[in-house]
A protein has these predicted regions:
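Aromatic/hydrophobic beta-strand junction motif of beta-rich domains
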Residues: 209, 222-237
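Bacterial N-terminal signal peptides
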Residues: 9-22
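Solvent-exposed serine/threonine-rich low-complexity stretches and specific carbohydrate-binding patches
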Residues: 245-272
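Primary recognition of N-terminal secretory signal peptides and signal-anchoring hydrophobic helices
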Residues: 4-7, 22-223, 266-308
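Conserved aromatic beta-strand anchor motif in extracellular beta-sandwich/beta-rich domains
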Residues: 240-244
Length: 308
């Protein structure tokens, strides 16, 4: 009979160890178990490629997404002419007339209601998404999960189809003392000799069919994390590495701090620093030059650090 309490304790311990990691819905914005996100900028994509905004950025106002018109028009092949408050856009067989401050526009003589007035901010004209869809005749979709405005095709390209491989030698010094991190298992496991050098503006892209949409900073109880928005449904998630010229490369497996899903999206968290961890507590994300994806791919994927 004396052995029974010990047996029960062992069975309880085994049961706890076998419990699955909790999976949370990304819709639970106030759930304290989910790391808190820092501000996520809105991105606009035309045919799954980002539109670059050099000064004024897209914004959310009164539950409507507003975008700077000229850069979107240019990306769509439109010719924009501004005279005072009057804007004319010629795109293919479509001529659009818009007056700053008005809630309507004209497309080939047809009146279109915009829902929100066009506005001028620091020399840029902002329009609601309805203008892009109805006045310019484009398919437009707002994705509140990724904070992406999709215009046109949503077909995300494979990374190897948009970037060329480069020699990895100029980047080998980042792995000094951690050479094992250079190993990739693509057509056999061996040190990488090539690399894809990626700008953050190259996202989204696919790696072996899995999409990477964006990287963002998050925190939970003093822990600093990177959140990757992907379709990577692997239980462990693909590992990352932080490459810093002044310290050893740091491998970051996907953390079990939370498993967060929203439809086809998977959110993987990577621990940058922890206040109780001697090795990482003083590490700041801006120290890294690159965030490296350790995927089994023709070359190492080196993303220029978007956080420094």
């Amino acid at each position: 009979m004396k052995k029974r309490p010990l047996f029960l304790f062992m069975m309880l311990a085994i049961g706890i160890m076998m419990m699955p990691i909790a999976v949370f819905s990304a819709n639970a914005d106030t759930d304290v178990r989910i790391p808190q996100m820092k501000s996520q900028p809105i991105e606009v994509l035309v045919n799954a490629r980002k539109v670059k905004f050099p000064d004024q950025k897209p914004k959310l106002e009164n539950n409507q997404v507003l975008v700077p018109l000229r850069f979107v028009s240019d990306k769509l092949g439109g010719k924009l002419d501004l005279k005072g408050k009057e804007i004319t856009i010629v795109k293919g067989d479509r001529t659009v007339n818009l007056l700053i401050g008005a809630k309507t526009a004209m497309a080939n003589g047809k009146t279109i209601t915009l829902g929100a007035a066009a506005q001028a901010v620091n020399g840029r004209t902002y329009v609601p998404l309805r203008f892009i869809s109805e006045a310019l005749g484009e398919k437009v979709e707002w994705d509140k999960v990724t904070k992406f405005v999709w215009i046109g095709s949503k077909e995300i390209p494979e990374l190897m189809d948009i970037l060329e491989l480069k020699d990895i030698k100029p980047y080998e010094h980042y792995f000094k003392g951690q050479e094992f991190l250079m190993d990739l298992c693509y057509e056999g496991c061996k040190p990488a000799t090539k690399a894809y050098v990626v700008s953050y503006d190259d996202l989204p892209f696919k790696v072996r069919g899995e999409a990477y949409y964006r990287l963002d900073m998050a925190n939970k109880e003093g822990r600093v994390l990177i959140r990757a928005t992907t379709t990577d449904k692997g239980v462990m998630g693909t590992g990352f590495a932080l490459l810093n010229p002044k310290s050893k490369a740091r491998y970051m497996p996907a953390s079990n701090i939370a498993k967060e899903n929203d439809g086809d999206f998977r959110f993987h968290y990577y621990l940058v620093s922890h206040p109780l961890d001697v090795e990482s507590k003083d590490y700041t994300i801006d120290e890294a030059d690159y965030l490296a994806i350790r995927a089994d791919y023709p070359g190492y994927i080196l993303i220029k650090n978007p956080f420094n």
